[in-house]
Amino acid sequence: MNDMGSSEVNDENKEKEARYSVMTKSELEALAVSAIREHRRLLWADQAVYEEWLRASDDPSISGPVLQTLQDEYVARQKRSEAQQEELSDILDALGFVPDVPFDDDN
């Protein structure tokens, strides 16, 4: 949960708007494509950690501290993904559309 007050949020939003307003549409589109690819990569990696955590949870030979470490890693990854998703959303808002980004073959 975000602990910032409404004036801090407004200041942050104005700063983001100003940052993207100086960029051309082609620059914004390139940034959006890069952010979309990064988002997909994070989702793929997060899913791999989650699946490992689930497998470890079902294995009685895995110690509690190891399970806790996997859970902590997953939660930390979720927080990073949330921040990246917010940034992507801001970029797409500034751009005005979602560019078509084909999936990479390696994911």
From Swiss-Prot:
The record's region (Disordered) falls at: 1-20
Q: Give the transmembrane region(s).
A: none
For this protein, the record's Gene3D superfamilies field holds:
HR1 repeat (1.10.287.160)
Q: Which UniProt keywords apply?
A: Plasmid, Repressor, Transcription, Transcription regulation
Give any single GO term for biological process. negative regulation of DNA-templated transcription
Family annotation (Pfam families): Prok-TraM (PF09228)
Q: Does the keyword Repressor apply?
A: yes
Q: Do the record's keywords include Transcription regulation?
A: yes
Domain of life where this protein originates: Bacteria
The role this protein plays is: Acts to antagonize TraR-dependent activation.
Record family assignment: To A.tumefaciens Ti plasmid TraM.
List the protein's name.
Probable transcriptional repressor TraM
Name the species this protein comes from.
Sinorhizobium fredii (strain NBRC 101917 / NGR234)
Gene name of the record: traM
